[in-house]
Each structure stands twice: as structure tokens, then as C-alpha cells.
């Protein structure tokens, strides 16, 4: 449901503008694991992002921060470009952002630029990054630079530190220095920190990413308490992780049949835009990004992506998984829906939970909020869903 403007101030027009900004935000999923997020304190959150568990949306206040950050970055870039002694390249030869890629393209990132000619190290190329932060965090970095020098970034923000190591290590050719320009909103104050490349830290980060990409189960939560500080304030996947009412979105990434393939050729520097490889074991096909986002009618949830039930039995021949809820009720995730007998497609289960699937009325009510009326009628008549699906992946 779209956000409606609520009267929280004396100007309903401003309320309506904020609601429009929030409702119109782009909420596409990212198709790779980003270096910028790899250092998140909760590994499961990193996996949810990689597995396209939800389309992330943000509150208006956060969207305004993003706008401020992008605008400030442009201002800072213009300032650096005005110093003729600097060899400053905010984009690559093709006019696009510099991109880095590792693990067959599954682990990627985009640099704000590269720079050479810094007065404190004029002959050395640096990864160039701009971070716009609140005043308190800005002051903290200034203090840490005085205390720790080139080690300040690691003490200031571990997530930024891992991002910096990744950008240096994955660059072609590999870079040995990172230059972060930290600014307050609007760019009124600037400070900086230079960071050396640490091969051991880079190796550790790549190994962590490979483990999160290839392991067949989700990592433990950072906390079992959904009100934990990180869960509450710094995770977009709190609902799908902690709530028994929410399932991951249907895509090939959430399917038990899909497998990421780490092919170094696919992730070579010249192939950053080609995308990493995923394979559907059920259809024995490689999956394009568009295929992955849509999924096929044969989709079965990875058991750990259906958080409100536990797998009981897998029938490979019929392509179905039987689950049990905490109170012992059974249902089946399968290709063809028969909701009266508790047999559900993944698209059905995406909008259901242990409570709503217990009665016909509540099931239809839940389904009607998300599915076209023709698809609801097909459930009543037991028509195969794929007979109605005219938007199948290209490989079907």
C-alpha cells in the first residue's frame, strides 16, 4: 500500500511532497554483493541483500540524506577538479564509474574515482572516495586521524575500511593507497584520511564474501532480539529475518534450485557489466539477471528463506517440499496450487504465513491484496498457474 500523507505539521503540502518522494522511490534489487555492504556487522543481512530477499525501500528522511550525499559529492568533485596539479579521474575511459569485480563478478563495487598528485604523496595513485556524514561522525574522524594517522579509517568505520581494502585490492592494476574525503552535509567542512592497502585484510574480506556467496544456509543473526540496535536501525531485512509473517520475495536467488558459479573469466575487469553466473539445477540452464528477478513456475523456496516453517520432506521427482509450522501443521510448496489441500506455489507463499493459510477466507483475502483477480480465480478452478503466465523467463 502506498504511503498516505499524514498531518504531522501545519503544512499538508509538505507532507504530501514527502509522501510522493517515498512512494516514487526506485526499489530495484542489486544483482551482486557490494563491497560497500560486505562489512555490515550482521552476515545474514549481507546474504539477504545478495539473495534479493526484499526490494529495499527507505523512509523519506533517508532518501533526503541520499540526495544530500550525492549533491555534496558532486560539489567536492568540482573542487578537486579545479586544482590543475591533480590528475583526478572521477570516471573511467568509457565515461562511466570505475568498477571493480571479484569472485566471478559476484562481488563488485564502484569507485568515486582515482586520483594522483596529492601534495602529501604526489607520485602515487589513490582510490578516491567521498563520504558525507553527520557533524558528530565528522568530528570523530578528525580526532581519530590525529590519534592513529593512516590507521584511523579502521577505527572510525569498519564497513568503510573493508570497502577501501576491497577497492584497492580488486582494482586493475591493484592500488596501494586509498584517499577518503569526509565532508559535512553540504560540503561546508572537509577532512581526509589516507589508508594503506593491507593484503591480509583484503584476503580475509574476499574469503568472507566467498563463504557468504556459496554457503547453502544463512548465517546466524547478529541477535535474536529484533529490537537489537543493528536490527532496528541498520538493517533493511528485519521483517523477513525476524517476523513469522514475512517471507522472502520470489526470485531465482531465493530458490532451492539455483547455484552461484564463481567463474573468474566472468568477473574479469573487462567483463564487469556482463554479470556473474547463476545456474538453475532444475532446468540445467544459466540464468540471466532478468530471469533471476522473475523466477520460473518451478520455483521452490530455499527452506531458510521461508522463516515461519521448517522443511519436513523433499520430493525431487514431483518438485515439492513439505513443511511443518511450529504448531505441527503441514503444507507443501509445489508447482501447482491447490490451496484447499494446503498446496501452494512460491508466489502464494510469498504473501502468506502460518496464520493466513489456515482458512480459505483468510487465504483469499491475503492473496487478493497482491494477485490479479484472474489468478485468484485460477486457484478456485485449480488451473495451473503457468497457463496464465505470459511473462516467463526467456529460457523456459
Residue ranges and their predicted role:
Residues 1-127, 134-145, 151, 349, ...:
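Metal-dependent nuclease catalytic cores that hydrolyze phosphodiester bonds in DNA/RNA
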Residues 124-130, 175-180:
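Conserved active-site beta-strand-loop modules that form the wall/rim of enzyme catalytic pockets
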Residues 132-134, 184-185, 284:
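A short beta-strand motif that forms part of the nucleic acid-binding face
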Residues 5, 140-145, 151-161, 166, ...:
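Metal-dependent nuclease catalytic regions and adjoining charged, substrate-binding loops involved
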Residues 113-115, 278-280, 299:
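Short beta-strand element of the conserved SAM-dependent methyltransferase core
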Residues 130-132, 237:
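Residues immediately flanking
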Residues 111, 196-197, 279-287:
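Secondary-structure transition/turn motif
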Amino acid at each position: 500500500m502506498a504511503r498516505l500523507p499524514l498531518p504531522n505539521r501545519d503544512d499538508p503540502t509538505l507532507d504530501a511532497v514527502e509522501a510522493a518522494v517515498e512512494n516514487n522511490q526506485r526499489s530495484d534489487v542489486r544483482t551482486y554483493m557490494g563491497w560497500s555492504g560486505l562489512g555490515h556487522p550482521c552476515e545474514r543481512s549481507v546474504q539477504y541483500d545478495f539473495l534479493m530477499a526484499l526490494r529495499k525501500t527507505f523512509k523519506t528522511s533517508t532518501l533526503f540524506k541520499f540526495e544530500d550525499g550525492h549533491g555534496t559529492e558532486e560539489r567536492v568533485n568540482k573542487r578537486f577538479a579545479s586544482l590543475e596539479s591533480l590528475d583526478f579521474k572521477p570516471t573511467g575511459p568509457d565515461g562511466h564509474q570505475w568498477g571493480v569485480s571479484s569472485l566471478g563478478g559476484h562481488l563488485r563495487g564502484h569507485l568515486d574515482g582515482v586520483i594522483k598528485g596529492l601534495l602529501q604523496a604526489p607520485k602515487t595513485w589513490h582510490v578516491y572516495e567521498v563520504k558525507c556524514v553527520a557533524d558528530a561522525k565528522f568530528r570523530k574522524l578528525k580526532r581519530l586521524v590525529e590519534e592513529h594517522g593512516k590507521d584511523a579509517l579502521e577505527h572510525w568505520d569498519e564497513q568503510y575500511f573493508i570497502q577501501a581494502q576491497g577497492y584497492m585490492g580488486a582494482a586493475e592494476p591493484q592500488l596501494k593507497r586509498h584517499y577518503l574525503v569526509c565532508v559535512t552535509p553540504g560540503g561546508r567542512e572537509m577532512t581526509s584520511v589516507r589508508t594503506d592497502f593491507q593484503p591480509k585484510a583484503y584476503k580475509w574480506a574476499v574469503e568472507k564474501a566467498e563463504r557468504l556467496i556459496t554457503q547453502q544456509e544463512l548465517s546466524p543473526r547478529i541477535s535474536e532480539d529484533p529490537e537489537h540496535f543493528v536490527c532496528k536501525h541498520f538493517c533493511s531485512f528485519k521483517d523477513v529475518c525476524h517476523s513469522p509473517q514475512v517471507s522472502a520475495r520470489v526470485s531465482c536467488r531465493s530458490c532451492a534450485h539455483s547455484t552461484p558459479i564463481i567463474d573468474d573469466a566472468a568477473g574479469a575487469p573487462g567483463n564487469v557489466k556482463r554479470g556473474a553466473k547463476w545456474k538453475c539445477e532444475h532446468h540445467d540452464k544459466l540464468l540471466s539477471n532478468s530471469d533471476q528477478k522473475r523466477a520460473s513456475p518451478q520455483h521452490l523456496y530455499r527452506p531458510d528463506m521461508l522463516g515461519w516453517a521448517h522443511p519436513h520432506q523433499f520430493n525431487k521427482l514431483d518438485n515439492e517440499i513439505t513443511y511443518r509450522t511450529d504448531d505441527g501443521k503441514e503444507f507443501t510448496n509445489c508447482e501447482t496450487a491447490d490451496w484447499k489441500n494446503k498446496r501452494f506455489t512460491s508466489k502464494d507463499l510469498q504473501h502468506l504465513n502460518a496464520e493466513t493459510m489456515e482458512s480459505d477466507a483468510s487465504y483469499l483475502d491475503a492473496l487478493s491484496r497482491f494477485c490479479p483477480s484472474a489468478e485468484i480465480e485460477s486457484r478456485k478452478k485449480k488451473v495451473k498457474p503457468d497457463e496464465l503466465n505470459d511473462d516467463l523467463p526467456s529460457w523456459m
